[in-house]
From Swiss-Prot:
SUPFAM superfamilies: L21p-like. This is Large ribosomal subunit protein bL21. Coiled coil: none annotated. Part of the 50S ribosomal subunit. Contacts protein L20. InterPro entries: bL21-like, bL21-like_sf, Ribosomal_bL21. It holds the Pfam family Ribosomal_L21p. The keyword Signal does not apply. GO terms for molecular function: rRNA binding; structural constituent of ribosome. The gene is rplU. GO terms for biological process: translation.
């Protein structure tokens, strides 16, 4: 089972036990969070697409770590002016593990051993 969630202005395709890096969310390691802005939920080729969100669908996740991305350097140089400026920026990020996906009105479904093995083989 997979879902497409929206968080931090971006969309992510997730399945149970996936570990993803997203824009910063409040919380410390071990906190449980829920994503309610679910754009699509599906099993295999069968999918439910929301308009804009799937009603009642919830994705549960756990915060693994809080961190920062690699530094992005913003460098400006003005030729022949002996002038340059260098700035760096590191975006705050949250690493989360997807625990389970609950479809609209249904119970939470966790990944079975077969689907986990198939996902590992595909990667």
């Amino acid at each position: 089972m997979f879902a497409v969630i929206k968080t931090g202005g971006k969309q992510y395709r997730v399945a149970a036990n996936d570990v993803i890096t997203i824009e910063k969310l409040e919380g410390v390691a071990g906190d449980k969070i829920e994503f309610t802005e679910i754009l699509m939920v599906g099993v295999g080729a069968d999918a439910t697409i929301g308009a804009p969100f799937v009603e009642g669908a919830v994705v549960s996740a756990e915060v693994v770590d809080q961190g920062r991305a690699k530094k992005v350097i913003a460098f400006k140089k003005r030729r022949r002016q002996n002038s340059k400026r260098s700035r760096g920026h590191r975006q705050h990020q949250t690493i989360v593990r997807i625990l389970d996906i609950a479809a609209a009105g249904g119970k939470a479904k966790k990944a079975s051993k077969k689907t986990e093995a198939a996902a590992e083989a595909a990667n």
